[in-house]
Amino acid sequence: MICVDHLCYHYKGGRPILRDVSFELETGHFLAVLGNNGVGKSTLLKCMNRILTADSGHCRIDGEDLLTLSHREIAKRVAFVAQHVPDTQMTVHDMVMLGRRPYMTWGVTEHDHHVVHEAMRYLNLEDMRGRFLNRLSGGERQKVMLARALAQEPTLLLLDEPTSNLDIRNQYQVLQITRDLCCEQGLTAMIVIHDLNLALRFCDRFLLLREGAVYRYGGAEIFDADALRDVYGVTGSIVDVQGHRLVLIDDEEKETRS
């Protein structure tokens, strides 16, 4: 169980970014963090991972408060995948092995090699282990970063717009892999994503932020005309969720249907 309680954050000398954010997420779910630009979506993930230090509040995994742990201990519980993938000459294998750093005390162990091998096998990267990241496509590099995150053996996976620079085929692939990790391995995942249709297709929980606060939280039933108007400024009378696709019906079309 992931439990975020009254999380607040503001930049020095600036306006509050997160305003008393609270929600609970059960193990094995895939949560989409949604909202307009500047409402605190990425900031929320970074506070949960202690990349940023929250002003107040708590973030607990199975009762353990992440905000009181060292960065090394957090990295054993939480993996973070950013939007931008390093363009480096590091090999695929070496990049995935970086996910084992929080556990290393006296060098690389046989267990480390086993975990890395399994992560690469799960992401179908075994044949690419010796290739350099700067020779890979954007979709391939993002799969490598997912493998590195998986090598951390985390409880919680945080993804900050990992699909924003990918074509639609690679977006689907990355999101499908993440959903499979939740379903098959009991991982819990949160993703910052802008495409509502993609979110509805792959995620099963949704957190709508507005002005840094929780506007709505739950399943697909949270989406209606009021939600899209208040959060995104989209106007219309009805919002239907049809086959994981949002359909907005304006007033004129509604009259035609009736």
Q: Where in this protein do the model-derived segments appear?
A:
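The feature captures the beta-strand-to-loop junction immediately N-terminal to the Walker
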Residues: L34-N36
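Helix-to-loop junction immediately C-terminal to a conserved catalytic motif
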Residues: N49
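Conserved ABC transporter NBD signature motif
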Residues: G57-D65, I74
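Conserved ABC ATPase "signature" region
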Residues: E110-M128, E153
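Conserved ABC ATPase signature
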Residues: F132-L136, E140
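Catalytic Walker B motif of ABC-type/P-loop ATPase nucleotide-binding domains
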Residues: L157-E161
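ABC ATPase nucleotide-binding domains
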Residues: V231-S258
